[in-house]
Every structure is written in C-alpha cells, then in structure tokens.
C-alpha cells in the first residue's frame, strides 16, 4: 500500500512489488516422533537495499516442528517459527515515525495438545500461539464430537491478548469469542 500522505492519508494505492521466493522442506521420524523443517527466503527484488518503506524488506523465514504421541490417543505438537528482516537499519531509518516498526526478528511458537476419547469420537484439543518477540498470544480450546461418519459438532473459544494495538494477536485483544458449529459431510 502506498499512502498519498503519511500524516493525512486520503488515498491509498495498492501496489504488489516483485518478489522471488526460494524454499525447501524436510520431514521425517526422529526423537520418537515426527520432526519437520521448512525454510524460505523472500527476495524483495524492487528494493533489495531496504530503503523504500512501502516495499517489504527481504526476509529469511524458517519453521521447525515436532509431533509425538505421548500415550494412546494423546498427541503433542510443537512449532517454532522465525522471520528475520534483512537490511533492518535501512528499514528503521526510512520507516515514517508515525508508523509502528516491525521487529528485526519475529518469533512465534505453538503448542497443540489433542486427546481422543470414546473410540475416537470425542476430541479435546488445545491450540496455543505465543509470540516471544511481540509478547502476544492466541488460545484456542475446542471440544468436537463425531455423531456419525457424516455429522459432527464442535464448541470452542478464541482468546486473544498481550502485545500492542498493532501486533498480530494484540490487535484482536477485545475480540475473544466462543463458537459452535455443526457439520454434515457427504
């Protein structure tokens, strides 16, 4: 997005700068579970020096994950995600002071706990996101029941908090909610 005036914006022009993406992923058994790794490089071709604040700087990103069945029908999953911004000093120098600044190193970790009960028809799950860099979080507890092979229902909640008014989950701090769903699949 390109604003016509950073202090008194009346018009925004949407702009999609050229971007090249390179990446790789690996997954396999290790540590009595499944380990996965993904990495990617976002090459910001139109502003490799990082001086144009309207074009995101190049970034290197990676994700490492681990999943293990701790006992019958109970699994744990962990993930750690990282974004590293290149040319951060140029980004800070050229970003207008009125705008919040991204971090040079953004981190996000997740935890998923899943318990299956009653011949795997009832699923209790808890999914948590936490950003050590932004200090914000999202918690998602859920109960799901399969009435048949075609009909299931779930109830859960989304709890947001921490961080700043502009961080990924902090901006949703007042948007906690409870949801219910019934689904028929054919």
Task: Give residue ranges: language-model regions.
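Repeated loop/turn-to-beta-strand initiation elements of outer-membrane beta-barrel proteins
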Residues: 32-36, 73-76, 119-124, 150-155
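Residues on the lipid-exposed face of transmembrane beta-strands in outer-membrane beta-barrel proteins
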Residues: 24-28, 37, 64-68, 78, ...
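Transmembrane beta-strands of outer-membrane beta-barrel pores
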Residues: 30-32, 41-45, 80-86, 115-119, ...
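Outer-membrane beta-barrel translocator domains and adjoining extracellular loop/strand segments
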Residues: 1-2, 47-54, 88-95, 126-128, ...
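Outer-membrane beta-barrel "beta-signal"
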Residues: 172-186
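Signature for the C-terminal beta-barrel architecture of outer-membrane proteins
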Residues: 1-74, 80-84, 89
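C-terminal structural cap/anchor segments
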Residues: 60-134
């Amino acid at each position: 997005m390109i604003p016509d005036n950073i202090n008194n914006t009346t018009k925004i022009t949407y702009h999609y700068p050229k971007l090249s993406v390179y990446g790789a992923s690996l997954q396999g058994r290790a540590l009595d579970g499944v380990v996965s790794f993904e990495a990617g490089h976002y090459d910001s071709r139109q502003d490799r020096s990082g001086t144009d604040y309207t074009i995101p700087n190049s970034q290197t990103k990676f994700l490492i994950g681990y999943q293990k069945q701790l006992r019958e029908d109970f699994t744990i999953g962990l993930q750690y995600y990282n974004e590293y911004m290149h040319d951060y000093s140029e980004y800070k120098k050229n970003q207008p002071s009125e705008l919040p600044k991204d971090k040079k190193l953004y981190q996000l970790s997740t935890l998923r706990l899943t318990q299956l009960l009653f011949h795997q028809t009832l699923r209790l799950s808890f999914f948590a996101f936490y950003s050590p860099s932004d200090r914000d979080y999202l918690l998602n507890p859920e109960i799901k029941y399969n009435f048949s092979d075609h009909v299931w229902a779930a109830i859960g909640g989304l709890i947001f908090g921490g961080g700043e008014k502009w961080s990924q989950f902090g901006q949703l701090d007042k948007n906690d909610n409870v949801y219910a769903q019934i689904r028929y699949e054919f």
